[in-house]
């Protein structure tokens, strides 16, 4: 990305300090800026090491972008933020859109399940492919928020868990 994009991101970081995720526009395109969680109280015990988890999320996104997986484009990142290109509305938004026919909704869902199966065939596990974490734009499915932190090495179990999360 251009230096001016990076400069714009730095300004946004100052304006949105502590805001976990927000959408912004730059030169007519939309992006999402995400920052590490800032946990307090009991959440520190329930979700320890938020900076480490954020770093792992960046590494996963880098890898998935490099292999051409169906994820939003990672445009910029550091230890303190990441910027993703907007991948469109999520499936839950599409499915609640009363202007779409059931045939159109089924087409979107069918596309998502085909891509999820394709990910699994490549040995990629999502961890929790909820419809709120799957976007659809211009006929293209993108998966977000990979959460495969399971200690299990049983690929069949992990794939089954993904399918159950998708169907939930």
What residue spans do the PLM features occupy?
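ATP-binding glycine-rich loop module of kinase domains
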Residues: 8-55
């Amino acid at each position: 990305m251009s230096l001016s994009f990076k400069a714009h991101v730095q300004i946004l970081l100052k304006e949105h300090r502590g805001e976990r995720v927000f959408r912004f526009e730059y030169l007519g395109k939309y992006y999402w800026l995400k920052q590490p969680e800032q946990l307090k109280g009991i959440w520190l015990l329930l979700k320890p090491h938020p900076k480490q988890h954020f770093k792992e999320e960046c590494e996963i996104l880098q890898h998935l972008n490099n292999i051409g997986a169906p994820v939003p484009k990672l445009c910029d990142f550091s230890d303190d933020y990441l910027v993703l290109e907007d991948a469109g509305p999520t499936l839950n938004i599409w499915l609640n859109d009363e202007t779409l026919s059931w045939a159109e909704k089924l087409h979107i869902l069918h596309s998502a399940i085909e891509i999820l199966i394709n990910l699994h065939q490549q040995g990629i596990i999502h961890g929790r492919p909820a419809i709120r974490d799957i976007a659809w734009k211009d006929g293209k499915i993108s998966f977000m928020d990979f959460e495969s932190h399971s200690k299990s090495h049983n690929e069949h179990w992990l794939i089954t868990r993904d399918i159950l999360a998708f169907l939930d």
